[in-house]
């Protein structure tokens, strides 16, 4: 429990502020451009998993989004294509979540490095985060994997398949 307010800064300066009416509008054309041009490039460049950081990003494009929201947990799985000045583009998958400021235990559990932006909806304010830092999302992934779940999104689907384990292992 903490009474101190979280600093509104990322590693490279103040967090980007996004104002829109609701979760779905956060992913309209105007806000997608903000994500592609400002928020995602800054976030990707700060991550160890992001390829060769010396390459110059020419552009980023969100080519697909899957809504993985469940109950009160708002999640979009973004498929991001990154174009560089040289070489072929690379594809990345980034699940993002919105956590309202009223969920203190969840917001405090997200490290500063996992926050992409501050978000202000008509009814609430909070943060847009990398879902890997959100425990309920991780639990949902593991449960879906264990259950062999398939999520359908119109013509697309996301299938969770368990891998093979060694014969002497007994995991339930």
PLM features: residue spans?
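Regulatory N- and C-terminal appendages and interdomain linkers associated
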Residues: 1-172
């Amino acid at each position: 429990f903490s009474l101190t307010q979280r600093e509104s800064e990322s590693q490279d300066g103040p967090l980007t502020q996004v104002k829109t009416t609701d979760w779905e509008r956060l992913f309209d054309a105007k806000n997608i451009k903000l994500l592609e041009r400002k928020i995602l490039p800054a976030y990707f460049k700060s991550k160890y998993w992001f390829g060769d950081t010396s390459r110059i990003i020419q552009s980023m494009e969100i080519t697909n989004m899957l809504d993985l929201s469940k109950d009160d947990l708002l999640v979009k799985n973004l498929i991001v294509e990154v174009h560089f000045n040289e070489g072929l583009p690379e594809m990345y998958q980034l699940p993002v979540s919105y956590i309202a400021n009223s969920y203190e235990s969840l917001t405090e559990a997200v490290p500063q490095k996992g926050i992409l932006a501050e978000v202000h909806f008509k009814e609430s304010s909070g943060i847009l985060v990398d879902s890997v830092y959100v425990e309920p999302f991780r639990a949902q992934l593991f449960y879906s994997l264990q259950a062999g779940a398939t999520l359908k999104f119109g013509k697309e689907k996301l299938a969770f398949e368990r891998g093979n384990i060694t014969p002497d292992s007994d995991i339930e």
